[in-house]
Amino acid sequence: MKGWFLVLFLIITAGGSVLSAAAFFYIAKSQSKFVKILVFALCTLVIAIGVRFYEETYYSFYDMSYIKGLQYAAMAGLDWLITWFALLPLAIVGTAVVFIKRHGKRSGVHKVHSVDTGRRRFLKRAVLVPVGAGLVTTFGLTDGNARVVTERQSLSFKSLPAELDGYIIGHISDMHVGVFLGADDLGRAIDEVVENNADMLVITGDLADEMCLVPECGAVFSEKASRFRDGIYFCYGNHEYFHDVQYVTTMLKNAGVHILRNEGVVIRPQRFPGQAFFVAATDYSFAKTKGAFERQAEKFTKQALQGRPQDMFTVLLAHHPDFFDPAAAAGVSLVLSGHTHGGQLIFAAPVASLKYAYLRGLYRQGDTYCYVNRGTGHWLPLRIGCSREITIHTLHTV
């Protein structure tokens, strides 16, 4: 998160947090509630400013010994903002219910007593709501940032030559090396792929968000590129263009990473002498409308597949999973994507699915598979029921 996007995120979450707190103070009939709301608002403002300062000036202290402490402080600030913001719908409903009860018609002492007793019972239960929400958010932030799961996929294809049965592709995506995950996390992810005996590593975009960490990423790739028999291949994501795409490109090339941009290459596996398959990758499409995106996706896919030998098994790297459709139409065997982060929150999946037809995991159209990586990293560390992911694809012949 950077620039105006970060500012907008902080304004919305901070504003929602203050409204949530104000609603809870109203429900509780808190004494001096205006003073409490003011203090809460000031604390929230300080937290929002602190998070923005951390993210926007990270480059100036990322190599200091106290950086981990600042990272934990920023995560605690996000915990506060996200927790109280998430309570806003419940706070609004609760305020409406209490308002109606307080201002509705009263008929006698018995009803007043009943309302007061019900309110006290409600308040005792309501206290647990912010506490519970805070615990869930804290878990989502800490677990989401600390844990990465290795998913192993065994995929069978009619188009894969029998001599290539057992070929292994490691897949990482959306690392977002930056204020919450560093180059050391990238290194550990690559080590995990190596330990699974992958022949090749593919990276489907959004590598780094903090340009000050790009040299460290380069050092990681330079050290580990030779550990893959058939190399490392990379396609651009949208975040490469949000920052300094040329800087990232230069780093990757100098480190021995192969960049494919609407082009492909014949791979001759070292472990399978005399065999070959085709790896291609598309650029990211910034088309604004669905129709324009579909046309550009089809165009980029055709460009990427130019020069593909007839009937050769083909793997396509595309940051956005909606490239699956033109790839399947073009007879690609396997599409590897990312971009969606899997929705990050399991209960947000139905909403995220409205935007992304292919949200996470494995999909199939005819003889074409598409796998959408949930993200090996993230720019917002909150994850619940949708952990970070490293994927190991083992290819088999039907």
Predicted regions and their residues:
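N-terminal signal-anchor transmembrane helix
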Residues: 103-117, 121-126, 141-171, 178-191
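Non-catalytic terminal accessory segments
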Residues: 1-145
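Generic detector of isolated residues embedded in canonical secondary-structure elements
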Residues: 76-79, 121, 154, 231, ...
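Soluble catalytic domains of enzymes that build or remodel membrane lipids, polysaccharides, and related
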Residues: 160-398
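Generic structural microfeature
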Residues: 72-75, 117, 150, 358, ...
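Generic short alpha-helical hydrophobic face used as a protein-protein interaction/packing hotspot
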Residues: 81-84, 126-127, 159, 197, ...
